[in-house]
Amino acid sequence: RYWLLADGSRLRLNARSKARPLLDGAQRRLELRRGAMRLEVKEDPRGAFALDCAAGRVDCASGSLLLAEERGAIRLVTLRGSARLTTGEGRQLAVAARRSLLFDAGGLLEQGPMQAGEDAWASGWLEVHDRSLAWVAEAFRPYLPGILQLDAEIAGNRVSGLFPLDDMHTSLDMLGRSLPIRVLRYSDYWISLRPA
């Protein structure tokens, strides 16, 4: 679901995500409190739209970008248009269009070209290309009402695929059929992934 903001920009939040708007006549600003957001920034004479997060700030004059928590850091993906990243330590970095960066308050952790499917959740899908099962399980958790346990023995298994986020039962079954794992459902609120 999208929200149309007062300046004409459009915001989409991922499951269990939270953002706080700080919009007034003088500034355009959002704070990512938890999860992931996609923002389509409309150009405005007041200047760039500021996105605050635990690890720094992103400014974008116009375009589309994704900001998401990932492994204790923040993922920034510039889908369309460029942005400026200011890390928690004050370092500034110009980010070109179609780039993907991972950063924390201490600075840049990784950067590279945008990967296919990084924003697929906005369309209801998780697109995975050679990621660990631990990464996939973490991506599934916001869409499950309870606990998803993952046995450490299988956490490193590599996964590729396209998974429907609005049908976790099917997504988990797909993992069980494609990997040497067992999906144990004790209830809708307690699911465990174990070695086969």
Residue ranges of model-derived segments:
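Short, small/hydrophobic-biased targeting/export segments
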Residues: 1-105
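N-terminal export/assembly leaders
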Residues: 107-196
